From Swiss-Prot:
Keywords: Coiled coil, DNA-binding, Nucleus, Phosphoprotein, Transcription, Transcription regulation
Known role: TFIIF is a general transcription initiation factor that binds to RNA polymerase II and helps to recruit it to the initiation complex in collaboration with TFIIB. It promotes transcription elongation.
Recorded coiled-coil stretches: 280-382
InterPro entries from the UniProt entry: TFIIF-alpha, TFIIF_interaction
Lipoprotein found in the keyword field: no
Lineage: Eukaryota, Fungi, Dikarya, Ascomycota, Taphrinomycotina
Annotated disulfide bonds: none
Ranges for region Disordered: 1-39, 70-106, 341-416
UniProt name for this protein: Transcription initiation factor IIF subunit alpha
Basic and acidic residues bias locations: 1-26
Length: 540
């Protein structure tokens, strides 16, 4: 086959006999007119590119890999530049600076051994020196070295950047058909490139990426893509945004905490496990008490012996005293007709019921009823004592006698009390034994349920029979536990004091005698006044 001129017959299209088309007759085929009338062919002459032209000129084919039609003359900003370079390499100006810095790089001399490579030579003295050599086609190696730096096409603004990738290889062959005078000219292509558009966002170099990874702070996956958005956010308003909301009933959450509130919750946890420990035998209540005791001992063990029972008793006394103080505060509010004592009630439970916070009218009614009951009790007691002029002992067992605590001692000679030998053990100062019938005792307990504990009596059975002989109307009352004006004035001279602290000072006397509850209120009204929610001594 001649490389200069080669005739190739190509079947272009078979003519349909039904269609009316002009007949084309070749000058050399006049004798075979009958055969050519059935089938018609078009001859195209293909001429191969001469060898001399192939040595001087090489033809490369490029293709833009995109869904859209790419026209560099329209979409690219001129001038368009196409060159071979590393896509990750910096620009020319940065490259010159890096070259200058690389020439003056500091080398750690301490890492270089003084004897050079003598140690390695000593180790490899008896090792056979071998080298593996692989023969590679020089043309293929040259092609590989050239393609290490791909073609990069970019416009003037740098918005359109396309990176080439060679397709095919040594085994592929592509040709181009170019129009010529007599037909087509066949030109073989040396390489076929596919151009892919590079991402618009910035990427980090190897050194920069390694520096980012060495930091302990977490790095998001697409932080380079979001860098521009963060810059825009920083440019905007950096003031924090606050939101307000309305609350239906805003009350302080803080309040007095009960003792043992920090302990663990008491609950029973059961697991349906076949491998669990066997169930403890014995009474369940005893086992539960034992567990509670062990739990308390474990909690108190952390105090290292600092726990004191007296401290717990003092806290309980303060807690009881606070109830008395609340009553006193209500009276003082009624006296001053203002809310000067609201701050002293900060320790109240915000979730307390309305029954605990009674109104002022209820407090006054309660005190009036208390005074009436005391008067009735005194009158009935004096009447019963006057009727019994002669001793009338009753049979009873020693266990039926129970002591009754009184706030005053009987010192009148007109009163005679029969005391049996078994009762001498409980006849102490501050105690008397009254001999009353069971009917009177039951009637007294039913009519005055609150006065019995107020007078200091203990629990007694209905069958107890106590007899009082003589007249008890002239029995003097012990006023040693009453609070006096001098004591209150002495406490106020030390300085301004709150209601709670003042009640705490007279705590023992208020418990000893119930008359101090109303007495201290009258004394405070007389000798004290309020200033900045504190009690101050009046100027006489």
């Amino acid at each position: 086959m001649d490389s200069q001129e080669t005739k190739v017959f190509e079947n272009v299209k078979q003519e349909n006999p039904d269609e009316k088309k002009p007949k084309v007759e070749e000058p050399d085929s006049q004798n075979n007119a009958s055969t050519q009338s059935q089938q018609k062919f078009l001859d195209f002459q293909l001429s191969w590119c001469p060898e001399s032209e192939r040595k001087t000129t090489k033809y490369h084919l490029l293709k833009f890999h995109s869904n859209k039609a790419i026209d560099p003359s329209k979409s690219f900003v001129p001038p368009i530049k196409m060159q071979r370079r590393d896509p990750n390499a910096p620009s020319s100006s940065n490259g010159e600076q890096n070259a200058e810095q690389g020439s003056s790089s500091n080398v750690n001399i301490a890492s270089i051994a003084p004897y050079g490579g003598a140690q390695n030579m000593k180790q490899n003295a008896f090792k056979r020196k071998t080298r593996q050599v692989v023969k590679v086609d020089p043309q293929a190696r040259r092609l590989q070295e050239e393609e290490l730096s791909p073609w990069i096409m970019e416009d003037f603004e740098g918005k359109n950047t396309w990176v080439s990738t060679m397709e095919g290889g040594q085994s592929s062959a592509y040709v181009l058909f170019m129009f010529s005078e007599n037909g087509f000219k066949v030109i073989p292509t040396d390489r076929f490139y596919r151009f892919n558009q590079r991402n618009n966002f910035q990427t980090l170099s190897i050194d920069e990426a390694e520096a980012k990874m060495n930091k302990k702070t977490p790095i998001p996956r697409w932080f380079m893509k979001k860098e521009s958005e963060e810059n825009l956010a920083e440019a905007g308003s950096a003031s924090p945004m606050y939101k307000l909301k309305t609350v239906p009933n805003a009350r302080p959450v803080t309040g007095p905490r009960a003792s043992g509130s920090d302990d663990e919750l008491d609950y029973d946890e059961e697991f349906a496990d076949d491998e669990e420990a066997p169930i403890m035998e014995g009474n369940e209540e005893d086992n539960k008490k034992l567990k509670d005791k062990i739990k308390k001992e474990m909690l108190t063990a952390n105090l290292f012996g600092e726990a004191d029972q007296d401290v717990d008793l003092e806290e309980e006394n303060d807690r009881q005293m606070s109830r008395e103080g609340k009553k006193l505060q209500r009276y003082l509010k009624l006296l001053e007709k203002n809310l000067a004592y609201e701050s002293d009630e900060e320790d109240e439970d915000p979730y307390a019921s309305s029954h605990d916070a009674s109104s002022e009218e209820e407090v006054l009614q309660e005190e009036e009823e208390l005074q009436k009951r005391e008067e009735k009790l005194k009158s009935r007691f004096s009447a019963n004592a006057s009727k019994t002029n002669t001793p009338r002992p009753l049979e009873r067992t020693p266990s039926s006698v129970s002591p009754v605590k009184a706030s005053s001692q009987l010192q009148s000679p007109n009163t005679s009390i029969q005391i049996r030998p078994q009762e001498q053990l409980i006849n102490k100062p501050g105690y008397i034994i009254l001999r009353l019938s069971s009917e009177k005792l039951s009637r007294f307990a039913n009519d005055f349920p609150r006065m019995v504990p107020s007078m200091g009596s203990t629990e007694t059975s209905v069958g107890d029979q106590v007899e009082v002989v003589g007249d008890t109307t002239n029995v003097p009352i012990d006023d040693s536990n009453l609070i006096t004006e001098a004591e209150v004035m002495k406490a106020l001279r030390a300085g301004p004091i709150s209601i709670k602290d003042l009640v705490h000072l007279f705590q023992r006397k208020i418990r000893a005698d119930n008359r101090n509850r109303l007495g201290i209120q009258k004394i405070i009204r007389k000798v004290a006044r309020f200033e900045n929610k504190l009690l101050v001594l009046k100027n006489y």
